[in-house]
Amino acid sequence: MRVLVKLSGEALSGEGGRGFDPERVDYIVKEIKSAIEEGFKIGIVVGAGNLFRGVELKNLTMARADQIGLLGTVMNSIYLKDIFERSGLKARIYSQIVNLPDVERVNYDSIESALRENSILIFAGGTSNPFFTTDTAAVLRAQEMRAKLVVKATKVDGVYDKDPKKFPDAKKIPHLTFSEAMKMGLKVMDAEAFALCKKLGITVKVINFFEPGTLLKALKGEDVGSTVVPD
């Protein structure tokens, strides 16, 4: 089974949400390695929030601020590749926005070859264009690696009818459609990502990635997190 895991940049950072935290990164490696060992084919899209925040770039034009963010995802991807390989895993980076020795152009034959050798695919540079989020990039790259599942790795154990951090009475919604999520105004993903999921028939699983073993449970179809399906 092929799956695209969407990681925020903050997932790589520790207290304060900046930079790289060795313990946090080791945890990510352990969770991904468990999935690889069970035979799952893994792709990753990572954000850049640990390096750059939108508020810090607010004085720039949106296009240039987005370009800085896209380059941040390349930096995070190179970091992840090195850590994965030091842990005995194979990893390859794909991006359309930079020309670096460790970064390949997106090529379907190369992607298929990498998956056959159980390499982790790390997609950097978003969609290659400004104005699109890494949520949209995750869905696009899932389609390119022929995955029908995107796992959104968060700090919350699923989708709620309102923010559980602010409202103690928030109710978890285990299963819903993209149309229902949009109608309820739930910020699972942005509208462009939702529309692409519906068009391509891709399911999104929202999990608390930082509960040990949850990723593997989600991939095995166990009842964790929330599942958002095309309608």
Model-inferred region functions:
Residues 1-231:
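C-terminal catalytic "cap/lid" subdomain
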